[in-house]
Each structure stands twice: as C-alpha cells, then as structure tokens.
Swiss-Prot record:
Organs and tissues of expression: Detected in normal lung, but also in placenta, liver, kidney, heart and brain tissues. Specifically expressed in most of the vascular endothelial cells, and also expressed in peripheral blood monocytes. Isoform 2 is strongly expressed in placenta. Isoform 3 is expressed in corneal epithelial cells (at protein level). Isoform 3 is expressed in vascular smooth muscle cells (VSMC).
Protein name: Vascular endothelial growth factor receptor 1
GO molecular function, one term: placental growth factor receptor activity
Residue sites binding ATP per the record: 833-841, 861
Gene: FLT1
Limits of the Ig-like C2-type domain: 32-123, 151-214, 230-327, 335-421, 428-553, 556-654, 661-747
C-alpha cells in the first residue's frame, strides 16, 4: 500500500523531470539553496540541527553515514514555497545531534543530467563539536583496515568534530608523519591525505589529538593488496631425464610479494587420465615475500608420459608460466664427441679457457678430467670442473698437454673417455729485455768489435730479425731514441751496408733453463756509428722487440776531465771536459768552494762554446794568468739524458807560487879514466820547473851519439870518455824568477892503447852475458811450458802444493767478465755488516742482478781504503775461485762482481738475513722440543730475556755483542739502533720453536754442501757453525767471508807462531803434519755436528788448548756426546773423528746416512729417539754418570730429558733401533777436575797461545794400533751452556810448555827440556792462506 507521502513525492519527481527536461533546452535551473550559508557550520553536540533546502525542482538529502534516515532524531518535511508555490522546499531537523553525525549534508535535485550534476547540488559540512570525542570515528582498540595501492592516493580518515583540533599522525613504532602541504596534506573534513603512497606507509598509523589535556587516539592499519608475480621456476633440471618405471617429481615455485594470492595449475601429456597427484603449500616465513609450492608427482613413468610439462600461475590479471620437457629412456647410456677438433689451441695469459666435450648421457655420469694421466683438479687449483667442461683459470704454458674426460655410470657399469690435446701458444719473450730496460744505456768503444745477443722464447718458436735505426749525426740536445726522430729503420743481414759493418748474424736453438729458446747473435765488426739495434721476435701470437742503444764513445766511460798540466802562478790553466754526446748534455764548468762546512757551486764566467764532434762534446776551460786564488776544485757538470741526474767529474787544482831556481848540489871537479863513462848531475828545483842547459867551455852542449841528456836535461851522461871530453862543464837552471848555475872541471886520464884493451874486454863481457841470458830465458820458458800442461781441474788452494805453487794456480783461473761483471751504478751500498783486518762486508741492494727484474738484497765484499796490491790480488783470486766453484743451494753463491776500473773491486754474494747457525742455535735453547707435537702444544708464554739483553736489547740481537757476524763468519759486526729496528721483522722467526728434525736437517744440508764442494775438489779448512749461515725457509749455506774475518780478535782462532788457527775444529793431521784434505774437513764436520746437537755449545768445554790437549787427541780421546744427540748421531761423530783419515766416511756417505735419519725422524716425529744425555732425574737438577749401554739398559727406568715437551708430565723415550756391542771411548770430560761441574760454553773457544816460532813442528807418533771408534754412552757431565757471547779472555799454555804473555814471551825451561815437553805444540810454518782464500769455503 503506497502512502500519500510517497505518492506526492512520486508526482513531484515526475513533474520535476518534466520541468528539468524542458529547462534543459531552455532556461538554466538555479542551484538548490541551503538555509545555512558557507561551506561549513560548527555546532555543539546535543543541539538540534535545522537545515532547509529550497530549489526549483524536487530534491533529496545526502547525509553522513552515521545519520540514519530511519532514526527518530531525524525528520525531513517537504512543502511548496516561493511565489505561487512554484518552488520546492525541504526542511531537515536533527534532534540532539551527536559528534559522529559530523559530515557533509547535501541537497540535490532528483533527476539531473550527468553534465549538470555539480550545478544542481548544494552541500555544507557540519562540525558537531564534542570535547569528549574529538574524532568522528574512534578506533582505539581495534585498528580500522585501510586498503592501499602503491603509487596512489591514501587517505587516513581521522576526521575531527571541530576544525580547531590539532591532529598528529604517527607510524608505529616511532615515526611521525608531518604534513608538508605537498605529499602529506591535513584536511579536517577528510583526514590525512598522502598523495603518492609507498611501502613506507604500510603498517599501523595512529591519529592523536589532545583536548583539555586528555590524549585521544584512533588507529588505522594499512593493507597493501597486489597481484604481482615475481618469479616462477621449476626446480628440477631441464630437460628431465628418467628411466621408464621411475617416479617423476616436479616442484613448481612461485614467488610473490606479501598480501598476494595465486592460483597454480599444471598441464602435462597424459592429463586426461589424471595420473598426477599435486600437493600445494605456502611459505610465509620470509619477511619480504610469499613462496607458493606446487609439487606434481607421477609414479611409474611410461613412454606416453614424456613431453612438455607446464606450470601456470595466476594472480588476478597477472599470469606467468614455466615448462620443462621430460624424456623417458629404456636404459643408461653415454655418448661423447669432440666439440671442435681433437687438437685445441689457446694463448698463455688468457683469463680462462673452457675445454668442453659434446656429451649425451643418462643418468648423469660422474665426470673426472685428467691432465697427462693425473687428476687435473688435484694438480692445480686453477682447474675447475663445470658440468662436462674443464675451466682453466689464468692459462699458462704449463697447461699444455693431453686432457682426458672420464665419464662413468657406476651403477649401470657404463664407462666412456675421450682425449683432447691442448696447445698453449706463448707470445715471444726476450730474456735480455729486462736488463736492457735500465734507463742508462751502455757505451761501446770506438772501433771495437761487439757481440749483441737476443734470446727469445715463445710457442710456436719465434723468428728473430735485426733492424738498424741510426741516430741523427747533428744530434746534440736530445736523446737518441727509437721514437725521437723520423729516420727509417733498416732490416739487417750479414751483407747489409747500413750502419756499422756486420761480421755475422747467426741463430741457433739452445736449451736454457730447461726451455728450447732461439738465440740470435749479431757481431759488429767495427763500431763506428751510433744508433739503435732492434731485435724483433715474432710468432703467430704476437711480436716483441728489444731496443739496444748502441752509442759509440771516444771517451773512457763516456765522461773524462783532462788537465794539460798543473800550472804555476802567472801561467794559463787549461782544462778540457769531454762527454759522450748521446748520453750527456748541458755541459758546464763550475768551481766548488767550502763555506761554513757546506759545499757551494759557483759558475765560471767566460766559458767557451762546447765543441761537438761525431761521438762526443768537448768543453774547454782556459783561465789566463792564474793566481794563487784560482786554486780549488774544478768540476765538469753534465746532465744524464736518460736519468736526468747531474754528474760531476772533479779535478783538484793547486796553483803553485813562483820560486827562483836553486841547485840541490853544485858540480864538483873530478877525474875519469879514458874510455870509461861518466855522469854529471845538475838537479835544480824551482817553480815553475827550471830548464837546464849544459855548456862545455862556454859552448852549449847538444845531445849527440855518446852524449846523452837525461830527463829534463838534469843529467849529462858521457859514454867512452875521450881526451876531447876534458874541459870545464857548466850547467844553468833558468825559469821566470831567475837562474842559477854551477861549473866543474872534468879531467881525463889514460892512453889510447889502454882504452882499446878495455874496449875488447867490455865487448867480450857483453857477449858472454848475452849468451847466458839467452840460455836462462830458454830454460825458464821450458819449465813454464811443462807446468802449464798440468790439469787445471785441481784449482785454488785445493791443488796439491807440491805440483804447482798456489799463486800460479790462482793466476790460471779465468774470470769471465761477460758472465759475472755487474755495473756499479746498479749497486746501492747500505750498512756495514762487518769488517776485518783488511777487508769489509756491506749490505747492498742490487737491481737486475742475475737478470732479475727486481731489487735484491746482497752482501758485498770489498777492500778497505789503502789496501795493498797483494790484498787486491787476494780478493781477485778469491773471486776467481768463486766463479770456478759454481752454484749450489747449500753454499753462499757468487752473484756478480765489479772489477772494471773507475771504482773499488767488489765481490757480490748472497745475503743471509738470519745470521750464523751458532748464534741461532744458542738463541733456541729455551725453545727446543723433541718433536713437533710437543712444539705445537706448548703453552704460550712470555719470551724470557737473555742476560745482557735487558737494557733495551732485543732477544734476536745476540750477535750485536759477539765477535761473530750474522752475515758471515768471524768479522766484527756494525750495528746501530736503526739497524736493530730493521731486524724486528725477523723476531717472529726467532720465536719459533726448533725440533730434533731441524737439527738433523741442518746437518744433512751442510753435508750436501760439503759433498758439492768436495766434488769441485775444494777444501774448506774452517768448517764450523760460525761459518754456516741461515737463510729463508730454514736453508743453511756454507760460507767463510775470509777477507772480512778479523781472526786477530776472534777467540776461535788460536795463535800458532805468527798465525791463528781454529784448533778445536782441526783434524790431527792438520795440526801435526799440516795436511789438509777432504777427510780433514770430515773431522771438522764431526765437530760441527757436536755444535749443532749441543745447540751452539763450544767444543771441548772446560778443556785448555795446550800440549796436553794435543797429546790426548793423538791418543784417541774424544769429546763426550752432546746434550741433545742421539746414539746414531754420536756414532756419526765418532766415525768422522777416526784416527785414520782413510777410515773416515766420505761426505756422500754422510749425506746418505743423515738422509735416512731425517726420513726416519719425519716418520716417527722424534718419538723413538733417546738423547744420549737425557739420562737425568727430571726434577733434581743434578747430573749423574752412568755406565755404558748394556743389554738390560733399556729395562731400567729413565727419566725424561730436559727438553721442552709442552707438558708438565714426565715423558719417557724408547729407542727404535738396536745398538751394537760398543767399545769404551775415553772422553776429555773424564779428566776434568770436577766432572759434574757446569761448563760455560762461552769460554774462549780456542784460547791458548801455543808455541813460539822457534818450535818448528808437532810430532805425530802412531805408537798404538788403530781401532774403530764406537759409542760409549757414559755421561760424565751435562753442561748447561748459557750466555750471549764469547766473553772470557784467552788463556795460555800450561807451565809445562812455558807461560806466554801477550806483551812478552818468557820460557822457564831450557831448550832441551822445552823441546821434550812441548813437542806437540810446534806450529806449521804458514797458514796465511786460511785467511786469503775463503768464501765460499775452500
């Protein structure tokens, strides 16, 4: 049933439509009018809202969401109004208005065309203010969800009930969003408007307002909804391969942003039968994305199931899919083929190279690549296996070879392999290029014959061509470079007439450093023209060139200053400076003056223009009428074109004051016999040197036959005086300051007959003397010819002195300057490492030595200033010996030498940074461990300072206070505080522990070095731990810097007559009979073993070096076993100390024995060795003497040795080898007064002044039969060696030999008793060669 109100509204609406329709084509409708004017109106809560709408047509109300039209509070009445009731009015009444009624109230016509909608609606925003409710909607407990889209507008609808309320927008947890009027806008009728929402606005947002001191909040939770699909994948490899009957499992993974839902479906070949089962799940553990899984499973796959499997993912309008193909096979198989050809090529230096094969197989086989029959990935870390490919990183020449791929399916017993050959081509390399790259080129003497070499290597073998690039003959200002002018380069051959005359160009293949290289030699027959020789090596990979600056010089060393003569006052000073024009420029003369201890450079005015010649530039300096003030140091300065360095050549000029001549002695009358000869001397001094003129009877004497004027005419010599020669002789000396003269009368006696007789006698005498001299010359030549035929392989001091004298041996040794000569300019001398009686050793930096492209630290031996010719000859002889010996790892090797004139003689050898072995072992006494396990488990502890190191010294520097050097043996070491700081980088090395394996290794290496020296027929004669240097990587090297050893200050060398000798290390035959051989070196090696296994102890501790020591040594008494020795090591020592040199082992045998011991030690790690002196009570600290080993020796309880074991528990050692029946060996320790006392190993090692020169030689008597030395394991003492250096003073012979003081020798016995008492103390006549010929050990 329709009410009247509804009927009226309906009729009004119809009428309005008619009116609006009519008015649309005619007059325009006016907007409805509201009774409240403006855009907003504020009222208080609880009041009644009256609002009337007047319009020209029927209209309706639009109200806020919280105002319900069915509410009893709301009433709307409609009526006709206006003139004649032609207008429509509607009155809205809202009783007791509430805060949530706040909003837009609008009135609009019922039927309005879309285009006129805005014009037919009127609205006003009503604020219903309530102090207890500032927000229209309150969500204080549960936040309101707001959906948002990134990039679009987001409205936070925290509307307020009064426009005057201040609202703050906050984002959990601590952010505050402040309106900026652009991106974030506050509107009291809408809330906060964010124009371009991002992910940052996702989360909990809170609007806060404070009213009357009370805080109100309303919460909103933004929710981003998206349909984005990030990625879709099938985790199974593509394509999928299966055997028939197996199960197929495909996992499809879809990744989406948060708040996204997807639909995942599958399509597959046999989908109609629905054989597949699908499981789905979602992983939301990721904070940034959702991961959806769909797993498809098909059991018992058949051939009909092969084909394409597709996974489709849809989210709203977004769609993605992924597919894979499935292959079904009946059985396993492998097929492999070459991808290209069997022989492959690549280039060295390539970042990576992929070696791959075409492989089809199922199931996936195991892949192994072999290189030359060995697993490639185990051979080098640069080989990586990727699928069926082998990746070679950073290709090198060593990567060439045969590569085999092994494919295997072991479960199906299917195997296949295929081999390919890889050739690695190498760009040519010229090995001389590194040396020729130095900025300062070489100079070649004018007219000399020169040989230029170019050695190239590459794969394939490169071809070498020579080119000539001439220098501009007018060149004077610029350097002659390949690019400095535009002159053409000419290819050379043997018949070329370009440049210098070519004698030959040859090429040959040579194996150098294990590689087959092409060596080309260009021989210049006559060096006349300066230019650049260019060596070009090329192959298919590339081309490389080497420029050889060939500068001709007519000046020695390219720079020379010449003084015509030293002028006197008033004369002219004439100097000339000549430099090579291609190497130097800006030539000028300067005068050097010293002012306030500073050298000042003063230019010299009025210098002449330089004269440019074909090869050089000459600048002359002439100072006319010099005075004494012109004395000084004149220097020619020139700038090196290549280095830019200014070079000075100095000449000291001393102007002498003029002095009138004066005679040193006047002439005196004298009488001579006829036919004899006479000489008249007239020596005069003066400045300048006076000119002498001779007169006879006032007539000037000229030189003629029979009358000879000596140098400067100061001597007049008359041959066969005749009667006519009698008269007055007058000499006159004249210079600018005056003249002086003297005269004498010469009387001639005798007759002509007598003179004829004298002439005949003189003639016969001359003939006889000539014949005698001729016969003597022939005899000497015959003797030299026979001696020169002696074989030269027995060289140096090792040659039998009875065959050829030592000096003659050394003179025969050749010195190859082309191989060993090193430019002094490339050698930078550093700190002094040590000095000796007449030589010194300095540390230096050598650039390019041994063709190395880098700077290398070396040791340089040189003479001190003022060295004599014999000392120079000694060092040169030593250099020749070094060149003869050759190279070996365990010998300090020669690197080069500087022998050319213009500088000091220098011998360059290897530098060993860790010093000598003796000092090193002493520093390790608190860090010695029997095996590596103990060393690895030791507790870290603060390193204890040695005595003497507490005052600011480092533990490393024990050689600072020692007479022994860390760089060589025996010389005094120069160390400053800065030197100490430079050695701090080695502290870590000195803190590392040392084990039994290290001691055996040192012994083994020294034996190897001595084996090498003995093979070169070299005898060391001073083999000791002080002459063993420790290099990097625990390598020891034998050395003996003989010229630098100051044996006069080293207590290891005992004076014997006028010579000091290392007696403790010398074999008996060397002491008594002066016999040196390889077997005497073996004796010294045994003493060296004793030093090593006593950790640097001094041999024969507590034993005086006197005649009693000689006698005991001759009787077979030997040293006890050292503290850290094993029975096998001690047996080796005793073998080396055999009385008969022939019974001592050869060094080759020692290498074999120690090699076996070293290998055994590595395998057993030291656990099965029993140190001989380890038979001590672990905690008592006392030393016991024990009997020799017996059968039940090892049944006794033995306490652990005093090694650092890394544990506080007692450790016992059990030997792993059998002992022979051992004879008893007498030891020196048994004779000492207090056998159990602790000896200081730093007593003077050799401290006895033995015999005077009057005692001629020792006596050696073989009164007892020879017996083989066996081990006696009787331990008589355990001396704890300690201290830093040899500090005690040398002691002297016992009273039985007579006491000898340093100042004066006094003997208390008469000669007969003396000869009987000290027959053992006579020195050999001369041991100077020990000093002269050493380093490396000879």
């Amino acid at each position: 049933m329709v009410s009247y109100w509804d009927t009226g509204v309906l009729l009004c609406a119809l009428l309005s439509c008619l009116l609006l329709t009519g008015s649309s084509s005619g007059s325009k409708l006016k907007d409805p009018e509201l009774s409240l004017k403006g855009t907003q109106h504020i009222m208080q809560a609880g009041q009644t809202l009256h609002l009337q709408c007047r319009g020209e047509a029927a209209h309706k109300w639009s109200l806020p969401e919280m105002v319900s039209k069915e509410s009893e509070r709301l009433s709307i009445t409609k009526s006709a109004c206006g003139r004649n009731g032609k207008q429509f009015c509607s009155t809205l009444t809202l009783n007791t208005a509430q805060a949530n009624h706040t909003g837009f109230y609008s009135c609009k016509y019922l039927a309005v065309p879309t285009s006129k909608k805005k014009e037919t609606e009127s609205a006003i925003y009503i604020f219903i203010s309530d102090t207890g409710r500032p927000f229209v909607e309150m969500y204080s407990e549960i936040p309101e969800i707001i959906h948002m889209t990134e990039g679009r507008e987001l409205v936070i609808p925290c509307r307020v009930t009064s426009p005057n309320i201040t609202v703050t927008l906050k984002k959990f947890p601590l952010d505050t969003l402040i309106p900026d009027g652009k991106r974030i806008i506050w509107d009291s009728r809408k809330g906060f408007i964010i124009s371009n929402a991002t992910y940052k606005e996702i989360g909990l947002l809170t609007c806060e307002a404070t009213v009357n001191g009370h805080l109100y909040k309303t919460n909103y939770l933004t929710h981003r909804q998206t349909n984005t699909i990030i990625d879709v994948q099938i985790s199974t490899p593509r394509p999928v391969k299966l055997l028939r009957g197996h199960t197929l499992v495909l996992n499809c993974t879809a990744t989406t942003p948060l708040n996204t839902r997807v639909q995942m479906t599958w399509s597959y070949p046999d989908e109609k039968n629905k054989r597949a089962s699908v499981r789905r799940r979602i992983d939301q553990s990721n904070s940034h994305a959702n991961i959806f899984y769909s797993v498809l499973t098909i059991d018992k796959m058949q051939n009909k199931d092969k084909g394409l499997y597709t996974c489709r993912v849809r989210s709203g309008p977004s769609f993605k899919s992924v597919n894979t193909s499935v292959h079904i096979y009946d059985k396993a198989f492998i097929t492999v083929k070459h991808r290209k050809q069997q022989v492959l090529e690549t280039v060295a230096g390539k970042r990576s190279y992929r070696l791959s094969m075409k492989v089809k197989a199922f199931p996936s086989p195991e892949v192994v690549w072999l290189k030359d029959g060995l697993p490639a990935t185990e051979k080098s870390a640069r080989y990586l296996t990727r699928g069926y490919s082998l990746i070679i990183k950073d290709v090198t020449e060593e990567d060439a070879g045969n590569y085999t791929i092994l494919l295997s399916i072991k479960q199906s017993n299917v195997f296949k392999n295929l081999t390919a050959t890889l050739i690695v081509n190498v760009k040519p390399q010229i090995y001389e290029k590194a040396v020729s790259s130095f900025p300062d080129p070489a100079l070649y003497p004018l007219g000399s014959r020169q040989i230029l070499t170019c050695t190239a290597y590459g794969i394939p073998q490169p071809t070498i061509k020579w080119f000539w690039h001439p220098c501009n003959h007018n060149h004077s200002e610029a350097r002659c470079d390949f690019c400095s002018n535009n002159e053409e380069s000419f290819i050379l051959d043997a018949d070329s007439n370009m440049g210098n005359r070519i004698e030959s160009i040859t090429q040959r293949m040579a194996i150098i450093e294990g590689k087959n290289k092409m060596a080309s030699t260009l021989v210049v027959a006559d060096s006349r023209i300066s230019g650049i020789y260019i060596c070009i090596a090329s192959n298919k990979v590339g081309t490389v060139g080497r420029n050889i600056s060939f500068y001709i010089t007519d000046v020695p060393n390219g720079f020379h200053v010449n003084l015509e003569k030293m002028p006197t006052e008033g004369e002219d000073l004439k100097l000339s400076c000549t430099v090579n024009k291609f190497l130097y420029r800006d030539v000028t003369w300067i005068l050097l003056r010293t002012v306030n201890n500073r050298t000042m450079h003063y230019s010299i005015s009025k210098q002449k223009m330089a004269i440019t010649k074909e090869h050089s530039i000459t600048l002359n300096l002439t100072i006319m009428n010099v005075s004494l003030q012109d004395s000084g140091t004149y220097a020619c300065r020139a700038r090196n074109v290549y280095t830019g360095e200014e070079i000075l050549q100095k000449k000291e000029i001393t102007i002498r004051d003029q002095e009138a001549p004066y005679l040193l002695r006047n002439l005196s009358d004298h009488t001579v016999a006829i036919s004899s000869s006479t000489t008249l001397d007239c020596h005069a001094n003066g400045v300048p040197e006076p000119q002498i003129t001779w007169f006879k009877n006032n007539h000037k004497i000229q030189q003629e036959p029979g009358i000879i004027l000596g140098p400067g005419s100061s001597t007049l010599f008359i041959e066969r005086v005749t009667e006519e020669d009698e008269g007055v002789y007058h000499c006159k000396a004249t210079n600018q300051k005056g003249s002086v003269e003297s005269s004498a009368y010469l009387t001639v006696q005798g007759t002509s007959d007598k003179s004829n007789l004298e002439l005949i006698t003189l003639t016969c005498t001359c003939v006889a003397a000539t014949l005698f001299w001729l016969l003597l010359t022939l005899f000497i030549r015959k003797m030299k010819r026979s001696s020169s035929e002696i074989k030269t392989d027995y060289l140096s001091i090792i040659m039998d002195p009875d065959e050829v004298p030592l000096d003659e041996q050394c003179e025969r040794l050749p010195y190859d300057a082309s191989k060993w000569e090193f430019a002094r300019e490339r050698l930078k001398l550093g700190k002094s490492l040590g000095r000796g009686a007449f030589g010194k050793v300095v540390q230096a930096s050598a650039f390019g030595i041994k063709k190395s492209p880098t700077c290398r630290t070396v040791a340089v031996k040189m003479l001190k200033e003022g060295a004599t010719a014999s000392e120079y000859k000694a060092l040169m002889t030593e250099l020749k010996i070094l060149t003869h010996i050759g190279h070996h790892l365990n010998v300090v090797n020669l690197l080069g030498a500087c022998t050319k004139q213009g500088g000091p003689l220098m011998v360059i050898v290897e530098y060993c940074k860790y010093g000598n072995l003796s000092n090193y072992l002493k520093s390790k006494r608190d860090l010695f461990f029997l095996n590596k396990d103990a060393a690895l488990h030791m507790e870290p502890k603060k390193e204890k300072m040695e005595p003497g190191l507490e005052q600011g010294k480092k533990p490393r520097l024990d050689s600072v206070t020692s007479s022994e050097s860390f760089a060589s043996s025996g010389f005094q070491e120069d160390k400053s505080l800065s030197d100490v700081e430079e050695e701090e980088d080695s502290d870590g090395f000195y803190k590392e522990p040392i084990t039994m394996e290290d001691l055996i290794s040192y012994s083994f290496q020294v034996a190897r070095g001595m084996e090498f020296l003995s093979s070169r027929k070299c005898i060391h004669r001073d083999l000791a731990a002080r002459n063993i240097l420790l290099s990097e990587n625990n390598v020891v090297k034998i050395c003996d810097f003989g010229l630098a050893r100051d044996i006069y200050k080293n207590p290891d060398y005992v004076r014997k007559g006028d010579t000091r000798l290392p007696l403790k290390w010398m074999a008996p035959e060397s002491i008594f009979d002066k016999i040196y051989s390889t077997k005497s070196d073996v004796w010294s090696y045994g003493v060296l073993l004793w030093e090593i296994f006593s950790l640097g102890g001094s041999p024969y501790p507590g034993v005086q070096m006197d005649e009693d020591f000689c006698s005991r040594l001759r009787e077979g008494m030997r040293m006890r076993a050292p503290e850290y020795s094993t029975p096998e090591i001690y047996q080796i020592m005793l073998d080396c100390w055999h009385r008969d040199p022939k019974e001592r082992p050869r060094f080759a045998e020692l290498v074999e024995k120690l090699g076996d011991l070293l290998q055994a030690n590595v395998q057993q790690d030291g656990k099965d060795y029993i140190p001989i002196n380890a038979i001590l009570t672990g905690n008592s600290g006392f030393t016991y003497s024990t009997p020799a080993f017996s059968e039940d020796f090892f049944k006794e309880s033995i306490s652990a040795p005093k090694f650092n074991s890394g544990s506080s528990d007692d450790v016992r050692y059990v030997n792993a080898f059998k002992f022979m029946s051992l004879e008893r060996i007498k030891t020196f320790e048994e004779l000492l007064p207090n056998a159990t006392s602790m000896f200081d190993d730093y007593q003077g090692d050799s401290s006895t002044l033995l015999a005077s020169p009057m005692l001629k030689r020792f006596t050696w008597t073989d009164s007892k039969p020879k017996a083989s030395l066996k081990i006696d394991l009787r331990v008589t003492s355990k001396s704890k060696e300690s201290g830093l250096s040899d500090v005690s003073r040398p002691s002297f012979c016992h009273s039985s030999c007579g006491h000898v003081s340093e100042g004066k020798r006094r003997f208390t016995y008469d000669h007969a008793e003396l000869e009987r008492k000290i027959a053992c103390c006579s020195p050999p006549p001369d041991y100077n060669s020990v000093v002269l010929y050493s380093t490396p050990p000879i």
